[in-house]
Design a protein with these regions (language model features):
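Acetyl-CoA-dependent GNAT
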Residues: 2, 9-83, 94-104, 154-160
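Short amphipathic alpha-helical segments embedded in low-complexity Lys/Glu-rich regions
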Residues: 31-37, 109-116, 137-140
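Short Asp/Glu-rich motifs
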Residues: 38, 120, 143
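Conserved acetyl-CoA-binding loop-helix of GNAT-fold acetyltransferases
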Residues: 80-82, 86-99, 118, 122-126
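Conserved catalytic-core motifs of GNAT/GCN5-like acyltransferases
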Residues: 110-112, 125, 130-150
């Protein structure tokens, strides 16, 4: 049975093999260390059963609290190993992050994704995320940059009656 737990610094070396998947954005070790330091409790790893606890997937999240806008959660990175896709791991990781963002008082959760990744788009929209805007040439790939969709899912809040 898959186990889910909070990401630790020593996991960064274990998840390295997942980073080289064609559908995964490649970030530096510094990126991941910074996220674990700045946003404790917002990153989670899914582990395979067995003594080695092989990583099956992970999510890195952020919580943004700026004076100029409402607080929100941001999915910085979500990856599930190709051999474990279609098992509901991405949904479980996203649901976890949405719940934590809600508990922290977020108004919504957002993410950015490549417009060519239709499987991810279908997953996110099936979970209630909606297209907010498109950013041209967001991913500066060689030789051809690719645009990104920003998707959002709002946290339901009760209406206040006065």
């Amino acid at each position: 049975m898959t186990s889910f737990r909070e990401m630790r610094f020593d996991d960064l070396f274990k998840i390295n093999s997942l980073v080289f998947d064609a559908l995964t954005e490649v970030y530096s070790l510094t990126f991941f260390v910074k996220h674990l330091s700045q946003f404790p409790g917002l990153s989670q790893v899914a582990e395979a059963p067995g003594p080695d606890g092989r990583p099956m997937g992970y999510i890195f999240g952020q919580y943004q609290l700026k004076k100029t806008q409402e607080p929100y959660g941001h999915v910085a990175a979500l990856t599930v190993s190709s051999e474990y896709r279609r098992l509901g791991l991405a949904t479980a990781l996203m649901d976890y992050f949405f719940m934590v963002s809600d508990l922290k008082g977020a108004s919504y959760v957002n993410l950015f994704m490549r417009i060519s990744n239709q499987a991810a788009y279908q997953l996110y929209t099936s979970m209630g995320y909606a297209h907010r805007q498109t950013f041209a040439d967001y991913y500066p790939d060689d030789p051809q940059p690719e645009s990104a969709y920003e998707l959002r899912k709002y946290v339901p809040r009760p209406l206040e009656v006065q």
